[in-house]
Amino acid sequence: MATLAFDVYGTLINTYGIIDLLNRYVGEEKALQFATLWREKQLEYSFRRSMMNCYEPFYTCTSNALEYCIDSFGVTISRDQYSNLIHRYRSLPVYEDVVTCLSSISERSEVRIYALSNGPQEDVQMLFKDGDIDQYFKDIVSVDEIRKYKPDPAVYQHFLDRTGSGVEDSWLISGNAFDVIGASTFGMNSVWIKRTEHQRLDPWGGRPTYTIQTLSELDALF
């Protein structure tokens, strides 16, 4: 039986779903760059906190990254606007191909579907309920439980321990190259969702078992 570990942010959940608010708050000419830097710093802070053994929940990394971007872009954000941005990040939309993919795969008795996320379980549950996809998941495995962030190998081992699955039967499904490389290096199978042509894998580390462009292609693999 295959056990699928779906990453959340950047795989199921579109982190650029914040653009409409940023268009209003920082201007259309800055919004995309702001959103990109926000995501990059969010991940950077999670990596650094994990390496430094200074764990804080993912929403703290998100908030700290937002503060960095506000300062970096030299924009003025009111307290209400700041709160709106943080709230929106906890209610981001699913990608358009997510529901069809999960609905199809969930019908297969030989596949178990889990989420494996850097986000706290309650935040992921909220996103899944908002996106009407919570019913497809057997459980949500969060790094909060071990206070280490992906791509630390302890996270992938924790997934195996929590789900009782063997490494050879476990598949990470992710749109994030660092996650795919981390899981592949650990020994898991992996599928990289390369949604845009400009995405690249780093020139070292594990390689994905499969590379696809949309989640609609996942159905043919299992």
Give a label for each model feature.
Residues M1-L43:
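Active-site neighborhood of HAD-like aspartate-dependent phosphohydrolases
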Residues L4, S103, P120-F222:
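Asp-based, Mg2+/Mn2+-dependent phosphohydrolase catalytic module
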Residues S46-S83:
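A metal-dependent, Asp-based hydrolase signature
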Residues D20-L21, L37, N64-Y68, N84, ...:
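Alpha-helical elements of Rossmann-like donor-binding domains used by nucleotide-donor carbohydrate transfer enzymes
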Residues D80-V94, V98-D130, F137-V143:
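Substrate-recognition element of Asp-dependent hydrolases with the DxDx(T/V) motif
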Residues E28-L37, F73-S83, V167:
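Short, surface-exposed acidic
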